[in-house]
Amino acid sequence: MTYSLLPHIHSPQDLHALSLDKLPVLCDEIRNKIIESLSLTGGHLASNLGGVELTVALHYVFSSPDDQFIFDVGHQSYVHKLLTGRNTEAFSNIRHDNGLSGFTTPQESNHDIFFSGHAGNALSLALGLAKGSSNSSSHILPILGDAAFSCGLTLEALNNIPADLSKFIIVLNDNQMSISENVGNIPQGISHWMYPQKISKLSQKIHSWIQNLPSFLHKKKTLSHKVDIALKSLSHPLFEQFGLHYVGPIDGHNVKKLVQALQMIKDQPQPILFHVCTVKGNGLAEAERDPIRYHGVKAHFQNTSLKKTSGNVELQTPISFPQHAGNILCRLGKKYPQLQVVTPAMSLGSCLEDFRKQFPDRFTDVGIAEGHAVTFSAGIARSGTPVCCSIYSTFLHRAMDNVFHDVCMQELPVIFAIDRAGLAFHDGRSHHGIYDLGFLCSMPNMVICQPRNALVLERLFFSSLLWKSPCAIRYPNIPANEKASNSFFPFSPILPGEAEILCQGDDLLLIALGHMCNTALTVKEHLLDYGISTTVVDPIFIKPLDRKLLQSLLTHHSKVIILEEHSIHGGLGSEFLLFLNQHNIKADVLSLGVPDMFIPHGNPETILNLIGLTSDHITQRILSHFKFFTPIPIERFFKA
């Protein structure tokens, strides 16, 4: 495609210079640029394609950064980046080395007000900006998807909006989707509460008629979209009850109508809810047909067939830890006919789709409501029913009190399947799963473990149902280096606090958590080149530690290395030092983990080099710390 307009847009001021008639052409160029770039890098595709016209219209009518846009989940900000001076090589490398972040990032641009990686916070942040702002001429525009209304934080903020708040426009991008289809009463209610029951029934009849049209009519989805807009315009909306002036619904793919509507409401003296209807994946036929699979894509997605990220995918090599976990839960579901699985909007990412399909009555997606997911799971456990709450490490932070008060304090046997434990690499600082141990380890009654491979993962899941205590099974989103057995029994259950010696040596004791055991075994081989023999231990459990085994090993090992892909604060290293202190054991300990800094996005090799967790870096740090010889200066490898 020839780009006639986009190369000349270096700021919103350049956009303002265009005539209204040229905006549709610009939108086409932006949409093509996103598809072209993400076909090389991967990234969040469908949500950005659906928001092209809306974002262009917002920047055309308002003046960023004086007017402030706050995106609810910054992964829908690619168009915003292109319009604010970031249509550079860095955009072509988005989420990779030397590329832009996949989220809004103030360090990148003063047009990004907040770093936004988690959902549901935009309205609260925007209200805070409005409360503290001294610039009465500035507009504040939180931009929310309809899925954000399943998040309690959004509703709390909605409850606090002053009726006399001016120049405050809530933009509701209603595509009836989260990552997957919306769940729960509230997102569905945004549509159903908009118009009376009679109109709702009429809508169902019309949509049914459209679906029965011949398949060669490819515009069925567009026709359905226009019907939705027309019917919603007949109704009195829910949001008026919250003191908001409702405007909409507006066709989110008609940039001229969007501009005209925004110009009309720009200076109204009360808070406004601007309701826009869009189609997720708009402009790319495959993404429109299957917005779930095209929500986030891998590089070269146009040259390969996208595979479903579900539990029982074809047994291809390698299979990731989450895929193994999904398979194991399906097998557990067959063995334990009462087992319930709960997730906060991560059914697809955590490979739970097969469990959902096989056991729909025993699967609950609560939407973007992590606290509710945890406490809901606690209620299930209290009834005597086994339950697994599957949740990303980075999202578990949001439910810390629920874990403490509703699970651990009640001594309820909720199994937490903590996905994405470890570095997130391309998603960057908001998504790294490297902090959860800091609060989980402090909670009484909590058992915490991490497998090094699929076989240990399998044993931990099956064993956890026997422990009868709260437990957390952590695992990363990387290939597991061994296949699970795919059998029920017999298997050897693991008791909390059972570690495993992987190899024995005389000079060093290297304790490595989870998948870092692979790195530890490589380091052991490197150290052999220097005549150093190493005992490598997989602790399996962070809490409780295998005290008996450790005490035995420490009688003839005084040099110890702890290796983990977690913050050096509050993880395995901290637990081990506490163990030494409690037992009055003296040892020289080198604790290696993620340094106390926010880790940026980038390719795995780059990030591991940055933080010193490659096998070469680790070997050099061990040699330097224990003074086995004078190594290459460590500053060349690592800066904390």
Curated annotation (Swiss-Prot):
Keyword hit for Magnesium: yes
GO terms for MF: 1-deoxy-D-xylulose-5-phosphate synthase activity; magnesium ion binding; thiamine pyrophosphate binding
Cofactor: Mg(2+); thiamine diphosphate
Signal peptide bounds: none
Catalyzed reactions per annotation: D-glyceraldehyde 3-phosphate + pyruvate + H(+) = 1-deoxy-D-xylulose 5-phosphate + CO2
This enzyme's EC code(s): 2.2.1.7
Keywords associated with the record: Isoprene biosynthesis, Magnesium, Metal-binding, Thiamine biosynthesis, Thiamine pyrophosphate, Transferase
Domain of life: Bacteria
Protein residues bound to thiamine diphosphate: 75, 117-119, 147-148, 175, 370
HAMAP family reported for this sequence: DXP_synth (MF_00315)
Protein name: 1-deoxy-D-xylulose-5-phosphate synthase
Organism: Chlamydia trachomatis serovar A (strain ATCC VR-571B / DSM 19440 / HAR-13)
